[in-house]
Amino acid sequence: GLVISNDFSPGRSALVSQTERRTNGFRRHFSTNENDFFRGAAATVNWKNLDINLFYSYRKLDGGVDSTIVTSFKTDGLHRLVRDREKMHKVSMQTYGGNVRYATPGLCIGLTALSYSFGNYSIQPDPKPYNLFYFRGNRNLNISVDYLLKNKLIKFYGETALSRNGAVASLNALQLTPASYFSLLLLYRYYDKRYQAFFG
């Protein structure tokens, strides 16, 4: 998705039927990856056609720290060398957010908000040509609206998101299925180069 979790939204696929958004809700972290997960508490409330999901996470990240400046994150999970151990669990990250979704068989609309901060640290990567538009600062906010309209022949779905700096990203798809053996998918992606989403 544009705000959170890459397996949460449309993506590229050889099969047209596999690009539609999947709403898996909260689930256990099974990967050996030490970075792409949350540690904390989550709750889901279902009422008629409305789902409300809220969560809070606090965890420590590995990173290169100079006083109160974080110049890089260490994401390989290895702590074999002294320099690796010096970066271990240096940066605290607090994340909270939620999603409210209204769903019927032909219509689904949701609102997602996510806020995260890095304690007393400021993220300031060393300036390089490839990271000119990376997130810099202590906190960020992402908000998105996702939508799905469908009937037997046509399906329109997508997500449009905004980051704290005002940059927009949007991912939309139109799927036409005139027959059970034939489907056509049009996918439109727009990402402002300034759009910043740590978990998107």
Predicted regions located by residue number:
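Outer-membrane beta-barrel channel domains
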Residues: 1-200
